[in-house]
């Protein structure tokens, strides 16, 4: 796994250039004519939000990359990170159109039976998934181009 100092340095580097842009715009504001200050202030607000979202997205993505590069088995992660690492497995098992062990030649028409067979297959293979190397998909940190509180909460909950 990446060393704490390396992770901290990457986060600090990203924050530094973003903060420098905000300071530059604040310095420009001081020299703008009074009748144009509102335009610069609006630009500052937009840039501030943009950097807030960008930094948040970068930090979460960097966290995911650090976990993925650590080559840690899923069984050694916290429960929440186990769920995140198994994101694609869960998606696969939600697919009721996929044939499986119990209905290899075709699926029954009954949805409840399809769900039951998919769940049973998952339970039978669960212990095998735990020995896989964790690979959390980037989409877990998707800010949906709008970092409203619900989106931030969702990402924090998943990681």
Feature map (PLM): residue ranges:
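Charged alpha-helical initiation segments
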Residues: 1-46, 61-63, 69-70, 74-84
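Helix-loop junctions and short alpha-helical segments
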Residues: 48, 60-159
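Extended alpha-helical coiled-coil scaffold domains characteristic of the BAR superfamily
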Residues: 50-54
């Amino acid at each position: 796994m990446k060393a704490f100092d390396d992770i901290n340095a990457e986060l600090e580097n990203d924050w530094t250039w973003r903060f420098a842009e905000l300071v530059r715009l604040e310095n420009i504001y001081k020299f703008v004519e009074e009748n144009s200050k509102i335009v610069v202030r609006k630009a500052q607000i937009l840039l501030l939000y943009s950097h807030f979202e960008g930094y948040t997205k970068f930090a979460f993505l960097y966290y995911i990359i650090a976990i993925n590069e650590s080559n840690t088995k899923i069984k050694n992660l916290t429960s929440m990170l186990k769920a995140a690492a198994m994101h694609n497995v869960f998606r696969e098992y939600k697919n009721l159109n996929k044939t499986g062990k119990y209905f290899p030649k075709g699926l029954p028409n009954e949805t409840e039976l399809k769900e039951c067979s998919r769940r049973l297959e998952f339970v039978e293979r669960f212990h095998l998934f735990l020995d896989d190397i964790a690979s959390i998909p980037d989409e877990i940190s998707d800010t949906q181009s709008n970092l409203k509180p619900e989106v931030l909460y969702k990402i924090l909950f998943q990681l």
